[in-house]
Regions:
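Amphipathic alpha-helical polymerization modules
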Residues: 1-145
Length: 145
């Protein structure tokens, strides 16, 4: 594995965790959004990551990974929370759930745990990047000496 490949792997990890943090921030910001442009309550969003392999490596049968990439962003299909608030403009007007409001399926505690996890993963990628940078600088010093 080349030194530049190490930089590429760390950079892809940093970009992935940044996207994950952006999605978590969106989820927290919309935790009380009862009506979106599509008409229903906000649904929690999650990123699905996969290992990145270059096409050339796959053709050669090599197993070397080259980082991580976002395969897709999915919506959490868990049910919405029902909160009784008959005066809310989005309250269900009739039926057995009359007066209830469908609230987003965002759990703030779960989002905060995910945020801490994403922060730690980001820090780990920064540490790996700094270690690779330090090795490159040492190699240059040895080459000069």
């Amino acid at each position: 594995m080349s030194l530049f490949n190490t930089f590429k792997i760390s950079a892809s990890g940093l970009a992935a965790e940044r996207l994950r943090m952006d999605l978590i921030a969106d989820n927290i910001a919309n935790a009380e959004t009862t009506r979106t442009a599509e008409g229903g309550p906000y649904r929690r969003k999650l990123a699905v990551f996969t290992p990145y392999r270059s096409f050339e490596n796959v053709l050669r049968g090599e197993l070397s990974l080259q980082g991580v990439k976002v395969e897709k962003i999915i919506e959490d299909r868990s049910p919405f929370k029902l909160v009784y608030d008959p005066d809310h403009p989005d309250a269900i007007p009739a039926g057995p759930q009359q007066g209830y409001v469908q609230m987003p399926n965002v759990n703030i505690v779960e989002e905060m745990v995910d945020m801490i996890s994403a922060t730690r993963a980001y820090e780990a990628n920064v540490t790996a990047l700094n270690a690779a940078k330090s090795m490159a600088l040492k190699a240059l010093e040895i080459g000069r000496g």
